[in-house]
Amino acid sequence: MKKLILAITASLCIATLISSCNNLGINAPKMDSDEATQLIVETLEKNINFDEWKIYEIRWMEADELENNLTVLFVEMVNKAGDCFSQTFTLSGPGKGNISDLDEAGGLRGKLDFEKVKGLTPASINVEAIRKQYEEAKAMIPENYTFKSIGDYLIQETVPSGNEFLDRNKTFGEVKAEFSMNITENGKEIVESAGKKSVQYYEVTFNVLPDGSVQMEELSLIHI
């Protein structure tokens, strides 16, 4: 996920040379706010023709790490011809309002059967439920650690990858969600190595369970 954020952030900065990358948070709703989640719903409603497209992946994220500013919405979807594409929407910062061209979806997946994809819609995003998930995850933060940001939120329908081995044991049509949360250890946010200082934080991944509760899955130490 960190590599994806860096790639998208770089493209945003290149596309807006007159502005500083440090201004990506201009007018940005906070990732953990109802406003941010509702903006995702409204962006999908406004920009996607659900008669012609079925979305199988929705991801929204911050760009500047630890700032907690909603910046980008990324979708992957299939058209009636079975061709898969991705598209990026810039929701805040200097590139606010930019919509990327359709890009062919990468990976092994080349085509999908449009009729067999159920499709994610704005109704797949429940603002109240997601707020409760964030609250539950924050309650799991250990003592002496501080919440900094929601890194990203992903909703994904399980679709064929194009590789039988990778697709074994998958339940096609199943919808899963997960999100990452960034936290810092109090008093240990800045570390120094070889005379260079860097920010140290932990990226914690949470899976959303079928009953709507969350489960901590993975913790990664990151330096920036």
Residue ranges and their predicted role:
Residues L102-Y153:
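Long, charged/polar, surface-exposed segments that mediate recognition or autoinhibition
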Residues V75-K111:
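Contiguous hydrophobic, core-forming segments of folded domains
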Residues L17-S20:
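C-terminal motif of bacterial Sec signal peptides marking the signal peptidase cleavage site
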Residues I222-I224:
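Conserved small/polar residues in nucleotide/adenosyl-binding loops
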Residues E52-T88, V159-Q200, V204-T205:
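Exposed beta-strand-loop-beta-strand "reactive/processing" segments of non-cytosolic proteins
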Residues M1-L4:
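Positively charged n-region of N-terminal signal peptides that target proteins for export
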Residues N22-L24:
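Bacterial signal peptide processing site
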Residues A28-K30, D34, Q38, E42-N68, ...:
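Short glycine-rich, low-complexity/disordered patches
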